[in-house]
Amino acid sequence: METVRSENTKAKIKASMAETHARRKSQICRVFELKVSIRHNPKSVFDKLSNCFREAKWIINDMLSLSKDNSDNSIFDYKYTDHKNVVHFDKDKNPVTSTITLPSVLHRATVAQKKTDIVNLSKAKAKGIKVGALKFKSEVNCIPIITGFTKILDASHITIPGFRKLKVNGLHQIEFEEYEIADAKLVRKASGYYVKLTIMLPKTPRTPTYRSGGLDFGIKNTITTSDNKTYDCKVQETEYLKYLSKMLNRHKTEKDSKRRWNCRKQLAREHEHVANIRKDIRNKIYHDLVSSYDVIYMQDEQIKNWHQTWFGKQVQHSCMGALKQKIKMLVKSDRAFVLSKWLPTTKMCPVCGTVNAIGLDERTYQCDCGYSKPRDWHSACNVLLFGTTKRAECVEHASAEVASSMPSGSTGFAQAAPLKRNLEAHRL
């Protein structure tokens, strides 16, 4: 039976949401990953966690099976209270009916998340983005938790729906006097089970450095700054990873064997280990750049196209693409400026302005005017030069447009929002 909310309840919800939105303006979002301790939790806890993800898969597949043609019309009528018994298939593809024992909070959140995903797919399809048909899930590795049902008990224990006291590692990261848990997710990885917490912290004023820097992406030196500081973000495959890949290839004919399953599990765990190292290096480089410069300039290099070249393997083993995307997110806050990739940052001399041809094997830029500098450092300095010039032109052009649109007799630039929109529109 559908619950009908009274007008008083709707007004309370609306007022609470408005209060939350006002509070979020003075807060900053941080995500912390807590690992469920393997040594200090009984085996029954992990059996229950495994069962939660198994039943979450059954619930999602039950939602998708409501319509034979996989249309999403009847999925929105799905009520978790009316589907306590679901039909799934065993390894021999025989239908089996099972009763859902998943905690109601996780059950409701799984259903709501799937409906939200379908709405987002519909919006993407309306924008012209190609989306495929809805397909059944072979596994589910993330279960959302409704806000308000996750609490930190002490320095090493938390409580989530279905688990009154869960021993986790990583709570030492949350050592703040004021914080608010906004969201939580239960995640399964190759290395174990995790609880990801989205924490809202009070904003602290940032001390400006009054410095700008240009970045140059390359192969030998992955990142070079205009201050001649280099970063290496390449992480090669480990020998153990290569060994496991060979072992998995040997057992490719034994598709259902336990030996192949164990090898796949070890290989996934090693891939996650290498990915974590790459992610750690990316975050450290990003933090160093953001804390050193107020504005970062870089070219819009197509890192994806570099994968098709003879040095593509080195690019794939680095985190250049992820780091570039993370820096581009600073464009909205005017802390990053992206230049066109066609600007001659490597060929142009910053002293006389001459454009000289230079080969890939030449590591030092030399001009007839006597200017000489290492290739990557020279490119980063030119990126900074082009960036400051183009940014000044964009600000001047956008300011002129805003001034022409203002009524006569008005003073100052009170229309700050149109100025910012015009600045973003005139970026290269």
Residue ranges and their predicted role:
Residues K68, K123-K127, D334-A336:
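Surface-exposed helix-capping loop/turn segments at secondary-structure junctions
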Residues E33-K35, K165, D183, S212:
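Well-ordered beta-strand positions in beta-sheet-rich domains
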